[in-house]
Amino acid sequence: MEEDYGVFILDVEGTVCPIAFVREQLFPYFLDKVEELINNADETERDLLADMQSRHGGAAAASLLRQLVAEDVKDPALKALQGRVWERGYASGEITAPVYADAVRFIQRNAGRVYIYSSGSVQAQRLLFGHVSNPSGDGVLDLTGHLAGFFDIPAAGRKTEAKSYERILAAIGLERQPGAAIFVSDSVAELDAASASGLSVRLAVRPGNERVSGARYTTLTDFEGL
């Protein structure tokens, strides 16, 4: 029996776009700009750098940034700094986001019912969905107007904690009807947390994703099946 959901909450990396985009394009782009970021930091960026350093033993900014990126640490200050650097890359046309064609169609078809939840900052999420490579031809698509909202670590909490999903459900008015929403991600740990909050879940299986053996969740290979 086909289930009908009123709200869709989507992960980004490995779900709506390839893991390779983040790891092989966005992260290297940021690392290439580290020295420029530090040397030309505005007041907000200086505050973010100082906050990050204070929480990581006062290490030198450049080496700390590279270390946190290499270890994929979900540091809020790092995510904010990455968002600011990527904003310049999107604005210059150096970066466009390769969102899967089926995900583009799904978001367009379900306008106003799709939320994004990522460890990347809300700013980075808006940039990504505002600069999508057009899968049907040339040019860039802006999908932000089709999306109902964005959540990140500061807004909701870490994605491996059930309370984070409870906060999202409360924010969108579904705390009493968690089963009316579905969360899609390539991470079993995230699905475990979301499921504990009462959300329905699907495991995204995309090219390049880590293989999940003995998966206990229904898989989704593209959004035409949702």
UniProtKB/Swiss-Prot annotation:
Mg(2+) binds at residues 11, 13, 186. It holds the Pfam family Hydrolase. One of its GO terms (molecular function) is acireductone synthase activity. One of its GO terms (cellular component) is cytoplasm. Its EC number is 3.1.3.77. InterPro entries: Enolase-ppase_E1 (IPR023943), ENOPH1_eukaryotes (IPR027511), HAD-like_sf (IPR036412), HAD_sf (IPR023214). SUPFAM superfamilies: HAD-like. Gene3D superfamilies: 1.10.720.60, HAD superfamily/HAD-like (3.40.50.1000). It comes from the Eukaryota. GO terms for biological process: L-methionine salvage from methylthioadenosine. Binds 1 Mg(2+) ion per subunit. It catalyses: 5-methylsulfanyl-2,3-dioxopentyl phosphate + H2O = 1,2-dihydroxy-5-(methylsulfanyl)pent-1-en-3-one + phosphate. Pathway: Amino-acid biosynthesis; L-methionine biosynthesis via salvage pathway; L-methionine from S-methyl-5-thio-alpha-D-ribose 1-phosphate: step 3/6; Amino-acid biosynthesis; L-methionine biosynthesis via salvage pathway; L-methionine from S-methyl-5-thio-alpha-D-ribose 1-phosphate: step 4/6. It is found in: Cytoplasm; Nucleus. Its cofactor is Mg(2+). Its main location: cytoplasm. The keyword Signal does not apply. Belongs to the HAD-like hydrolase superfamily. MasA/MtnC family. Bifunctional enzyme that catalyzes the enolization of 2,3-diketo-5-methylthiopentyl-1-phosphate (DK-MTP-1-P) into the intermediate 2-hydroxy-3-keto-5-methylthiopentenyl-1-phosphate (HK-MTPenyl-1-P), which is then dephosphorylated to form the acireductone 1,2-dihydroxy-3-keto-5-methylthiopentene (DHK-MTPene). This is Enolase-phosphatase E1. It comes from Eremothecium gossypii (strain ATCC 10895 / CBS 109.51 / FGSC 9923 / NRRL Y-1056). The gene is UTR4.
